[in-house]
Amino acid sequence: MSSQKGNVTRSRPQKHQNTFTFKNDKFDKSVQTKKINAKLHDGVCQRCKEVLEWRVKYSKYKPLSKPKKCVKCLQKTVKDSYHIMCRPCACELEVCAKCGKKEEIVIPFNKEPDAPENTENEGSGHRRRCGRKEDSDEDLDAESDSDGEDGDTQA
C-alpha cells in the first residue's frame, strides 16, 4: 500500500466499529465536569462553537486556571478557555472571540436571553403560587361548609 495521504479512497469499511458512544461523564462525575458540560459557548462563530463542543464532548476541554491576556486591550481579562479576546473587545469589534475573524456570531454575548427566561419562570411560579392559594382557600371553604353541616346535625 502506498504512503500517499488524502488522494486515496478507502476500498473497505472500518475494521472495528464502536458499539457505544463515548460519554465524558461516565466515570468522571466531578463538579468541574458538570460545569464544563453546562457551559454555554457564546460570542464565537459556528466553526469555533463546533470545535469547543467537540472538545467538551470528548473530554479535551481544559478550563483556564487564571485569566489570559486579551490581544486587543492587552489586559488579563480573557476568562474563557481557547479564546483570544475578552468579551467587551469581541462585542465592540463584532468578531469571534476565539479565532478573531469577522464571522457571524452564533450566540451573542448579550444577557437579554437570560432575563426573559427568568421572568417566564417567575411568572409560572406566580401562577402556581396563586393556584395553591386558591386551592387552600377552597379547602378552607370546604372545611367551614362541613363544619356548618356538622353544626346543623348537632343542633
UniProtKB/Swiss-Prot annotation:
Modified residues (N-acetylserine): 2
Keyword terms, alphabetized: Acetylation, Phosphoprotein
Keyword Acetylation annotated: yes
Residue numbers carrying Phosphoserine: 136, 144, 146
Signal peptide: none
Composition-biased stretches (Acidic residues): 136-155
One Pfam family it belongs to: DUF2039
Region (Disordered) location: 1-22, 110-155
UniProt-listed InterPro entries: DUF2039
Matching PANTHER family: CHROMOSOME 9 OPEN READING FRAME 85 (PTHR22876:SF5), ZGC:101016 (PTHR22876)
UniProt name for this protein: Uncharacterized protein C9orf85 homolog
